[in-house]
Amino acid sequence: MATVVTFLVVIVGWIFSLCLHEFSHALVAYYGGDTSVRDKGYLTFNPLKYTHPVYSILLPMIFLLLGGIGLPGGAVYIETWRLRSKRWESAVSLAGPAANLVLAVVLAIVLHFAPVSASGVWPGLAFLGLLQIMAMVLNLVPLPPFDGYRVVAPFLNPEVRGRIDQASNIIMLVVFFLLWYVQVVNNIFWSVVEWIAVQLGIPLSLAVMGLTQFQFWRR
């Protein structure tokens, strides 16, 4: 029963966090001048409005189910030419990872004051908090197609930016390959994630328990 509860908590919570991530992009874009996000339904918090069949569903679920890694995967199309400045464009990109951090902090506070136990809810929430940190760290990588790149991209030479954007898909595959198969890169990634989790007060032992219960098919 605990396994089922954990699985549902993580899946539902992860979908909510994807919506929050993309909603945050859209909200900042709206205040930055791109009112088209309202017409596109991005301010409704409707999961269907943020859906891309590959980036929103397929890749995130594969990474989550096979590797327990929180891959951010929404799809909000911002009309950047409407934004008031390059700084607003950077702020829009930062809004998503910031939302993941805020949710991680909220979950850490809940876990701190709640009667934490090994039942399905609490390990699920702890693992969900860890997923938020993973998503934030991964999304801040300053390479396309991650938000970290979108933060600095407005200030790049247009020709340089164009060439980098053309190689976006290849760069993404290289990043995932390094993260998955190169031990040094994997260790650095997890060290950063764990350090942030400890600073926020997310119990790592409970999060690991949540991961184990979530991936029940590996037992």
What are these regions (language model features)?
Residues 1-219:
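Hydrophobic transmembrane alpha-helices and their immediate loop junctions
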